[in-house]
Amino acid sequence: MPINLKGRSLDSALNFTTAQINYLIDLAIDLNAVNTKLHIQNRPLAGKNIVLLFQKDSTRTRCAFEVAAFDLGMGCTYIGPSGSNFGKKESIEDTAKVLGSMYDGIEFRGFKQSDVDALVKYSGVPVWNGLTDAEHPTQMLADYMTIKELKGDLKGRKIVFAGDIKNNVARSLMIGAAFVGMDIVLVGPKAQHELVQNGAGYKEVFEQCQALFQLNGGSVSFSTDKLQAAKNADVIYTDVWLSLGEDFSLFEERIQELGQFQVDMAMIKAAKSDVIFLHCLPAFHDDHTSFSLEIKQKLGKKYPVVKTGAMEVTDTVFQSKHNMAFIQAENRLHTIKAVILATLGY
């Protein structure tokens, strides 16, 4: 049966079926293959308009949505963190109704999953989750598109996520693994293992993923030993130790908690020889940002793991042939284009 997602919102990936998620990944691969022609010959969504509502800034998410919109022939409005009264002087419900009356689709990137849910409920148009504290579904689609392009069939592949396994990227990666039938190992602090499986706001998601693994194959497991976990891995993935919006003062605590899970060449060498490294970016892999330089200067002597300014991944890994994070970043464009086209056009 043909997949029809017209009018749907990408609020949570868990509201989709296995067939629908894999369809979006394959559609993105197809769109990438015809990307040049699409630029100059085809504007399938000409006359439509979308709005990007950002509470959190982002390079990749904003650029991917804007370029996707232009490629598809649409108008696109960006509203940044200070550009609206969303949830402050105007209720989310009222904002949703206003935007829904003017636009054909709404992208939201912010904090609360409940804000996405409210936009879906009251806007009357497709809403796309560009990131919340709970989930990052457009990133997940790009992650598995990248793996499929580089590795072929996803079923039975092994992916290892090392670091803050309770965050939205790790959660979305687990959800994606359950949809595509991959084995995922979450490598992080022991206390987070219990949280991800049974914590408030986590348990239901974990149980839904377990049901999907039963259906599609694959598995989720946990480890505190990054080298053991990396054995036979096809993919090693990490993310920043401190998310956008969290206070800088938390860095020392995170270094203490997560430093042992830094992705280094020992971990890469423990994996398959053709292992790929992925990161949703931005990455702290050297001292070339103000944040990482400050960490190096203030904490590098106390904590040797960050003495170069690198945090979640060493610069040696990031500069190696294994790093596919920039292909992954480009694939944000193709997967977002697939989501827009599927929900507005097909």
Swiss-Prot record:
GO terms for molecular function: amino acid binding; ornithine carbamoyltransferase activity. The keyword Cytoplasm applies. GO terms for biological process: arginine biosynthetic process via ornithine; arginine catabolic process to ornithine; citrulline biosynthetic process. Pathway: Amino-acid degradation; L-arginine degradation via ADI pathway; carbamoyl phosphate from L-arginine: step 2/2. InterPro entries: Asp/Orn_carbamoyltranf_P-bd, Asp/Orn_carbamoylTrfase, Asp/Orn_carbamoylTrfase_sf, Asp_carbamoyltransf_Asp/Orn-bd, Orn/put_carbamltrans, OTCase_ArgI. Carbamoyl phosphate binds at S58, T59, R60, T61, N85, R109, H136, P137, T138, Q139, C280, L281, R332. Pfam families: OTCace, OTCace_N. It comes from the Bacteria. It is found in: Cytoplasm. L-ornithine binds at N168, D239, S243, L244. Disulfide bonds: none annotated. It catalyses: carbamoyl phosphate + L-ornithine = L-citrulline + phosphate + H(+). Gene3D superfamilies: Aspartate/ornithine carbamoyltransferase. Its EC number is 2.1.3.3. GO terms for cellular component: cytoplasm. Reversibly catalyzes the transfer of the carbamoyl group from carbamoyl phosphate (CP) to the N(epsilon) atom of ornithine (ORN) to produce L-citrulline. Belongs to the aspartate/ornithine carbamoyltransferase superfamily. OTCase family. This is Ornithine carbamoyltransferase, catabolic. It comes from Mycoplasma pneumoniae (strain ATCC 29342 / M129 / Subtype 1).
